[in-house]
Swiss-Prot record:
Keyword terms, alphabetized: ADP-ribosylation, DNA-binding, Glycosyltransferase, NAD, Nucleotidyltransferase, Nucleus, Repeat, Transferase
UniProt GO BP: double-strand break repair
GO cellular component, one term: nucleolus
Species lineage: Eukaryota, Viridiplantae, Streptophyta, Embryophyta, Tracheophyta
Organism per entry: Oryza sativa subsp. japonica (Rice)
PARP catalytic domain segment(s): 434-660
Stated name of the protein: Poly [ADP-ribose] polymerase 2-A
Reactions it catalyzes: NAD(+) + (ADP-D-ribosyl)n-acceptor = nicotinamide + (ADP-D-ribosyl)n+1-acceptor + H(+); L-aspartyl-[protein] + NAD(+) = 4-O-(ADP-D-ribosyl)-L-aspartyl-[protein] + nicotinamide; L-glutamyl-[protein] + NAD(+) = 5-O-(ADP-D-ribosyl)-L-glutamyl-[protein] + nicotinamide
Chain positions covered by the region annotation Disordered: 40-92
Segments forming domain PARP alpha-helical: 308-426
Length: 660
């Protein structure tokens, strides 16, 4: 598609789409071709959705719940749906450049795919008549030198404003942001009440995936109150409404609590024992810390801070990598999580446990293929853990296979690690003069970089190279740095297993988002709320003797090629060897300390190395085991007591993905 373009033209096209424009011509061509194919697929999806919506005569989402727009009248509180049924169809008929011009004329960002620009236009406030302007007026209405053209070229920047415990919604008008804050009242029996509510509702059958925000506002000078509402499709701006001003706090609270009850069928005062109702919104519990983790600069140490820190340069670089909230947000967005509706810094443990609980119930019915119940439970999961699916049909995202269940389970696990990380990174008691060093101290680990020529470094490099499985051919790996690591208190807990037989040095990989939590808290076993069917050999901590098996769990990509893995000394003792899945494997037979999921290929045991302190390093080249014909290609080792684990090394690696 793009091979005929010159390099500068390729770069321009990629930059116009907000994509990475680095690399040589073949890389640029592949990247642009992939973007164009994606745009074409998205355009087809938008076109189909617009046709379906026009045929049905109803809204895709929002306050209408699918009602015919022609029959709907303006609500008393101003919460009406879009006025024109044909907006989506009109926008779909416009060219990409015309859509960009229209977006700029409304002060909106004009980058991204055609579908993204259309969604932005559909969800942003349009002209006073609610319709789409004539495309010719947009494309040709301004002369080249017109000041309005320059104004249109300025992309509108939306900022978050925080006063007190809660952040003002980003779409509240600027003049209100400057003079109001979220109402916070202290009561003798209840303590602080923060009048800020974010709610979600996903109904797969009705193609609903929508949010509702309510904030009671108090003027900074006191004496004036308002209530702000915003609602719409998850991932879109939606519509909003300001109620007031009210002269008394009680009026604003009455309006806020009335709206909350109307949307959820729950009383605000009883929200801690919230009950979910069909076709009603579910309240998303927020954790109001003392600092805003999304905007506080200290959570993402910069390059300048690395230069100023007392940390050794290699350690500083690694800590900066794993303690980066922006990275965490980006990685979660890539797997579908919507951090705008439930910011990572506001995650509460109860939300994580609710996510696990719904997945557990899905696991109980997934084998029965009960489509109706799976739709209902999937909607419940996406309500608790918000996802941005754009305007795609929700039926495409039903959690109806063990693979999909496993993917969502891994997402909730990552959110659990991020919940720990954000609490860690928000701590105000740390050294503000050297925040990177403060982050390091909070991990409660001692890191020592290994030198390239050292014996330990060479051993680990050999272990890595030899145990890259022949089925894992889509990437190679470069070692960026290897650290010797000691977690505070871990050796003492491990001591009772230090002389146990069969101690091995094994791999453990995980998402980049998870490492601040893992290093500070140690490797942990899934909570009771998690479904056992998500774990092949029961709930435990899983390890591998093949590097690439663990490396796959880093979920690196072209966009983020960094990965982190652990090498742990694991006291396996006598193992319970299994060829196939057993979700109750954690109930070990008497005398067994661990489970081994037996693979068809494993490192040649004759080539293993034994360290001076008696730890087996299975660094031999892979060898097929014809007699072992279970369901696994490679071995897995599982322990059900975290005291059997001692972290020994941390590896920072870079993935090189092969051309397809």
């Amino acid at each position: 598609m793009s091979a005929r373009l010159r390099v500068e033209e390729l770069r321009a096209e990629l930059q116009r789409r907000g994509l990475d424009a680095s690399g040589n011509k073949p890389v640029l061509v592949r990247r642009l071709d992939a973007a164009i194919r994606k745009e074409e697929e998205e355009e087809a999806a938008v076109s189909a959705a617009a046709k379906e919506e026009a045929d049905a005569g109803g809204v895709v989402d929002g306050e209408g719940n699918g009602e015919d727009k022609r029959k709907r009248k303006r609500r008393g509180d101003g919460e009406d749906v879009d006025n024109s049924e044909s907006d989506a169809a009109k926008l779909e008929g416009m060219s990409y450049r015309e859509l960009q011009a229209l977006a700029k004329s409304r002060g909106l960002a004009a980058n991204g795919s055609k579908k993204e620009v259309i969604e932005r236009l559909l969800c942003a406030p349009s002209d006073t008549d609610g319709g789409v302007q004539d495309k010719k007026k947009i494309a040709k209405g301004f002369a080249d030198g017109d000041d309005r053209v320059e104004e249109c070229r300025k992309e509108k920047i939306v900022t978050a404003t925080r006063k007190g415990a809660a952040v003002l919604d980003q779409h509240i008008p600027d003049h209100i942001k400057m003079t109001y804050h979220v109402l916070q009242v202290w009561f003798l029996l209840k303590g602080d009440e923060i009048y800020d509510a974010t709610m979600n509702q996903t109904n797969v059958g009705d193609n609903n995936n929508k949010f509702y925000i309510i904030q009671a506002l108090e003027s900074d000078a006191g004496g004036s109150f308002m209530v702000y509402n915003r609602w719409g499709r998850v991932g879109a701006r939606g519509q909003d409404k300001l109620h007031g001003p009210f002269s008394s706090r009680e009026q604003a609270i009455y309006e806020f609590e009335g709206k909350f009850h109307g949307k959820t069928n729950n009383h605000w005062s009883d929200r801690k024992s919230f009950e979910c109702y069909a076709r009603k919104y579910t309240w998303l519990e927020m954790d109001y810390g003392e600092a805003d983790r999304e905007t506080n600069k200290k959570v993402s140490p910069s390059t300048d801070q690395i230069k100023e820190t007392k940390l050794e340069t290699r350690i500083a670089s690694f800590i900066s990598l794993i303690c980066n909230i922006s990275m965490m947000k980006q990685q979660m967005v890539e797997i579908g999580y919507n951090s705008d509706k439930l910011p990572l810094g506001k995650l509460s443990k109860s939300t994580i446990f609710k996510g696990y609980d719904v997945l557990k119930r899905i696991s109980n019915v997934i084998s029965r293929a009960d489509r109706r119940q799976l739709e209902q439970l999937t909607g419940e999961f996406y309500t608790v853990i918000p996802h941005d699916f754009g305007f795609k049909k929700m039926r495409e995202f039903i959690i109806d296979t063990p693979q999909k269940l496993k993917a969502k389970l891994e997402m909730v696990e990552a959110l659990g690690e991020i919940e720990i990380a954000t609490k860690l990174l928000e701590d105000d008691s740390t050294d503000q003069d050297d925040p990177l060093y403060a982050r390091y101290k909070q991990l409660s680990c001692d890191f020592t970089p290994l030198e390239v020529g050292s014996e330990e470094y060479s051993m680990i490099k050999t272990y890595l190279a030899n145990t890259h499985g022949k089925t894992h051919t889509s990437y190679t790996v470069d070692v960026v740095q290897i650290f010797k690591v000691s977690r505070h208190g871990e050796m003492e807990r491990f001591q009772k297993f230090a002389t146990a037989g069969n101690r091995m040095l094994l791999w453990h990989g995980s998402r980049l988002t998870n490492w601040a939590g893992i290093l500070s808290q140690g490797l942990r076993i899934a909570p009771p709320e998690a479904p056992v069917t998500g774990y092949m050999f029961g709930k435990g901590v899983y390890f591998a003797d093949m590097f690439s098996k663990s490396a796959n769990y880093c979920y690196a990509s072209e966009a983020c090629r960094s990965g982190v893995l652990l090498l742990c000394e694991v006291a396996l003792g006598e193992m319970n060897e299994l060829l196939n899945a057993d979700y109750d494997a954690n109930n070990l037979p008497k005398g067994k300390l661990s489970t081994k999921g037996v693979g068809q290929t494993e490192p040649n045991t004759a080539e293993s190395k034994i360290t001076d302190d008696g730890v087996v390093v299975p660094l031999g080249k892979p060898k097929a085991e014809p007699s072992k014909r279970g369901s696994l290609l490679y071995n897995e080792f599982i322990v059900y007591n975290v005291d059997q684990i001692r972290m020994r090394y941390v590896l920072h690696v870079s993935f090189n993905f092969k051309k397809r």
